[in-house]
Curated annotation (Swiss-Prot):
InterPro entries: CDP-OH_P_trans, CDP-OH_PTrfase_TM_dom, CDP_ALCOHOL_P_TRANSF_CS, CHOPT
Protein name: Uncharacterized CDP-alcohol phosphatidyltransferase class-I family protein 4
GO cellular component term of the entry, any: membrane
GO terms of biological process kind: phospholipid biosynthetic process
Chief subcellular location: membrane
Membrane topology: Multi-pass membrane protein
KW Membrane (keyword) present: yes
Organism of this sequence: Dictyostelium discoideum
Family of the protein in this entry: Belongs to the CDP-alcohol phosphatidyltransferase class-I family.
PROSITE patterns registered for this protein in UniProt: CDP_ALCOHOL_P_TRANSF
Membrane-spanning parts: 30-50, 70-90, 117-137, 142-162, 171-191, 210-230, 241-261, 268-288, 308-328, 333-353
Annotated disulfide bonds: none
Compartments where found: Membrane
Length: 379
């Protein structure tokens, strides 16, 4: 399978690199400069997956979670490392004169994986229910995809004052550390909103639910801003809105398929929540990475990708069982197969796109050319 078209291979060497307009408070005033780059970021991604499995196996209780508190602390530390590496890897690449379209793709690819995994980690740490974790997953992935869709038109990845790569990750670090120190009980504190609204609204909610609700609102507001900016830019570029709005079709198919699947068989998600979200994360990352490749190579957007076939197949399998009472394949097996297939697609894409880009750009992956100037050591 070839991921770059002949047209893309011609355009790829001429790619000048997109720019990131990061208004983040953390990025401008707090984040330090270091020597590390994508390797530790990739390590953090694999740790995130391991964290989810370790927590899922321990199954701590609200009354006694002392046996796994160290995992929450370790999670916070690894999110911090990932955040630092993600913020400085571009600086390190420019410093060593190894900036390339492949490095940009690798950076955003790691981000796409962590965008799906981070809500799962924080949700487990804060004791959020499975359905709320899924809502948080959707709330995180929608603005992320739309931000890269917007970049296709503007050639700028715009990150607002409160954004995922920094502020949201800092909040995740804080939440994990608080859980590790005090335990999950702190997130189940009841808040009486009738006091804040002069008794006009009678509502009492848990702290963790209120936090996730606020984060979801911020995500959807950000997504709306992405759509508005992309629409204005498409009009300025004289691109028909039909063409512009058809480009997110793969993500819309992904989103709608998942919603229908959960509507048909909610118990299936509750039985395998971690495997389910990991499968969705791999498919989401695949779709986003293909979008980035098309932007870098100045190719036309594709409206469908092969991993979506298997997601749709799982939905149809469940629909046949619910409406026709025909069990083509056991639902639990279908979830596990989707996980294996989506992971396989992600591995194949990663290996193949590295080979293709290295061949076109005449570079070696994860190496600093000998012709590059030596790096000065920090005192």
């Amino acid at each position: 399978m070839v991921y770059i078209t002949p047209k893309g291979k011609i355009n790829l060497p001429n790619y000048k690199g997109g720019t990131t307009i990061d208004k983040s408070i953390m990025y401008q005033y707090i984040t330090a400069i270091g020597l590390f780059c994508n390797f530790l970021g990739l390590f953090s991604v694999f740790y995130f997956i391991g964290f989810n499995e370790s927590i899922g196996g321990n199954k701590p209780t609200l009354e006694d979670d002392s046996s796994v508190r160290w995992v929450y602390l370790f999670a916070g530390m690894m999110i911090f490392i990932y955040m630092m590496m993600d913020n400085i890897d571009g600086k390190q690449a420019r410093r060593t004169k190894t900036s390339s379209p492949l490095g940009e793709l690798f950076d955003h690819g790691c981000d796409s994986l962590c965008t799906g995994l981070l809500p799962l980690i924080v949700g487990i740490s804060m004791g959020i229910r499975s359905w709320e974790i899924l809502i948080a997953f959707m709330a995180a992935t929608i603005p992320f995809y739309l931000a890269h869709w917007e970049e296709y038109f503007t050639h700028h990845l715009v990150l607002g004052a409160l954004n995922g790569p920094t502020e949201a990750e800092c909040m995740a670090i804080l939440f994990c550390f608080l859980t590790g120190i005090f335990g999950q009980w702190i997130w189940f504190i009841k808040i009486d909103f009738s006091v804040l609204t002069f008794n006009h609204i009678q509502y009492t909610g848990q702290l963790n639910e209120m936090i996730f609700f606020a984060m979801a609102i911020i995500s959807f507001v950000t997504a709306f801003q992405n759509i508005l900016t992309s629409t204005k830019k498409a009009i300025d570029m004289k691109i028909s809105l039909f063409t512009a709005y058809s480009q997110p079709i793969p993500f819309i198919i992904f989103f709608c398929s998942e919603f229908i699947w959960l509507k048909l068989s909610p118990s299936l998600f509750l039985t395998y929540p971690i495997i389910h979200i990991l499968s969705l994360t791999f498919i989401f990352s695949y779709v986003v990475c293909r979008c980035i490749v098309q932007r870098i190579c100045q190719e036309d957007f594709r409206l469908f990708y092969k991993p979506l076939i298997f997601l749709i197949g799982c939905v149809l399998n469940t629909a046949a069982k619910v409406y026709l009472n025909i069990e083509i394949l056991d639902e639990q097996i279908s979830v596990l197969l989707l996980f294996a297939i989506s992971l396989g697609f992600m591995f194949h894409f990663t290996y193949s796109i590295i080979q293709e880009m290295c061949l076109v750009l005449k570079i070696n992956a994860f190496t600093i050319p000998s012709s590059s100037p030596p790096i000065k050591k920090l005192n």
